[in-house]
Amino acid sequence: MANYFNTLSLRQQLDQLGRCRFMARDEFADGCQFLKGKKVVIVGCGAQGLNQGLNMRDSGLDVSYALRQAAIDEQRDSYKRASSNGFTVGTYQQLIPEADVVYNLTPDKQHASVVEAVMPLMKKGATLGYSHGFNIVEEGQQIRSDITVIMCAPKSPGSEVREEYKRGFGVPTLIAVHPENDPEGKGWDQAKALASATGGDRAGVLESSFVAEVKSDLMGEQTILCGMQQVAAVLAFEKMVDDGIDPGYAGALIQYGLEAITEALKIGGVTNMMDRLSNPAKVKAFELSEQLTDLLRPLFEKHQDDIISGEFSRTMMEDWANGDANLLKWREETGETAFENAPAYEGEISEQEFFDHGILLVAMIKCGVEVAFDVMVEAGILPESAYYESLHETPLISNTIARKRLYEMNVVISDTAEYGNYLFANAAIPILREKFMPTIDTTVIGKGLTAASNQVENKRLVEINEAIRSHGVESVGKTLRGYMTDMKAIVV
């Protein structure tokens, strides 16, 4: 199979990258009615598979799970998850032939083998669904011509898809139809119905393309969503402990601080996050963010370039073929970091203290969000897509860190995201250790600014506020957040 994106002409590539339209609420007036009475068979029951399935069932759809015979015979975790939640579970041969929609929610590395196994069993005119287009775009999977191919891609980990739905809300979602596979013209109606059934229409849905979803999703998860947060956790903890701060406090400041800081980001963008700081702290965070940008922008650009060209996918698939040697090595190394092994903290940290003592964390989040957004837009991805793949999803990843640190983040995200995260973090950490962290002290991470540093020039503050508010991610973010009026605060 050849990389699908690389078979397109430049004009076609730019057209597919630039597919992005925020859909009006009235376009979902029929909810998931288009799929009512249809048989939806989900293949795989991991985080996305289970949680999307629960939402779809609660929305009134007929949902069952097709698993490999061995998974059923050995009662593996996927079987236990599906059966314990009361779903019908069967083999591919038992369930796929009657399915109207086969929804492939297995890990990326399994997509090719899964599709090759289920496609001969699918009835004529059935639909194949994805939540990530890697198999279509990067692996170039060829799908039978009578099959409709759609995507419904919630922009969050599977656990958050469920939690937001239970709150009466949802997570922003991208939908798409593969241009090579819509023989009956029903793809968009089905994709809209899936988005409604999983709760996405309550938060906002983007009409996108397989190409735009893949190229933006890979960039977001590698840089700001996972990579930058892992970099922040590892380096901030090292600095605090080296400077004499209690390891328990340092670990808690990062583990729960990232969640508190990015909750402010979610509710009101970079502007609100920065406004939670005192004026002197805001100036300091802004200046640190500018320094970080100068050092890390070339790395962000390299990641986006490698994603666009297919180089990232090529090297990752080589690692798949090598038994995930690099992935497993990097996972083990992450588990051995000092932050991951920090003792529990018995004290309490107030919400404001996370900001006052975590100026460096704020600066790193600001840098990551803005640079990831800018680099995606420069590559031809539209601002709306870039916003969801940078700013909006960041707090959802921070929530996983708050549960069980980096281990939880890397368990919840896909193997593809985890691989890209390590690739970015392993490159960024040495750069910052050498060129940035020696300039950092406990005034910006661990203790906060002293009274003597509590001064700021009015003109400088005005310039900084204007720079923050006028950034592209803030402009599009204000518009998109306007559609999410029912957003509930995660941190109570």
Curated annotation (Swiss-Prot):
Identify the residues that bind Mg(2+) 2. Answer: 217, 389, 393
Tell me the cofactors it needs. Answer: Mg(2+)
The free-text cofactor remark is:
Binds 2 magnesium ions per subunit.
Q: Detail which positions bind Mg(2+) 1.
A: 217, 221
MF term (GO), any: magnesium ion binding
* Residues at which NADP(+) binds: 45-48, 68, 76, 78, 108-110, 158
Reactions that this protein is recorded to catalyse = (2R)-2,3-dihydroxy-3-methylbutanoate + NADP(+) = (2S)-2-acetolactate + NADPH + H(+); (2R,3R)-2,3-dihydroxy-3-methylpentanoate + NADP(+) = (S)-2-ethyl-2-hydroxy-3-oxobutanoate + NADPH + H(+)
The keyword Ligase is assigned to this record: no
Q: Which InterPro entries match?
A: 6-PGluconate_DH-like_C_sf (IPR008927), 6PGD_dom2 (IPR013328), KARI (IPR013023), KARI_C (IPR000506), KARI_N (IPR013116), NAD(P)-bd_dom_sf (IPR036291)
Biological-process GO terms, alphabetical: isoleucine biosynthetic process; L-valine biosynthetic process
KARI C-terminal knotted domain: residues covered? 209-344, 345-487
Q: Name one Pfam family in it.
A: KARI_C
Q: Which residues does the annotation say bind substrate?
A: 414
Pathway membership of this protein? Amino-acid biosynthesis; L-isoleucine biosynthesis; L-isoleucine from 2-oxobutanoate: step 2/4; Amino-acid biosynthesis; L-valine biosynthesis; L-valine from pyruvate: step 2/4
Tell me its EC number(s), please. 1.1.1.86
Entry keywords, A to Z: Amino-acid biosynthesis, Branched-chain amino acid biosynthesis, Magnesium, Metal-binding, NADP, Oxidoreductase, Repeat
The KARI N-terminal Rossmann domain is annotated at: 14-208
Concerning NCBIfam families, the annotation shows: ilvC, PRK05225.1
Q: What family does the Swiss-Prot or TrEMBL record give for this protein?
A: Belongs to the ketol-acid reductoisomerase family.
Tell me, in a sentence or two, what this protein's role is: Involved in the biosynthesis of branched-chain amino acids (BCAA). Catalyzes an alkyl-migration followed by a ketol-acid reduction of (S)-2-acetolactate (S2AL) to yield (R)-2,3-dihydroxy-isovalerate. In the isomerase reaction, S2AL is rearranged via a Mg-dependent methyl migration to produce 3-hydroxy-3-methyl-2-ketobutyrate (HMKB). In the reductase reaction, this 2-ketoacid undergoes a metal-dependent reduction by NADPH to yield (R)-2,3-dihydroxy-isovalerate.
Record's PANTHER family?
Answer: KETOL-ACID REDUCTOISOMERASE, MITOCHONDRIAL
Spell out the protein name for this chain. Ketol-acid reductoisomerase (NADP(+))
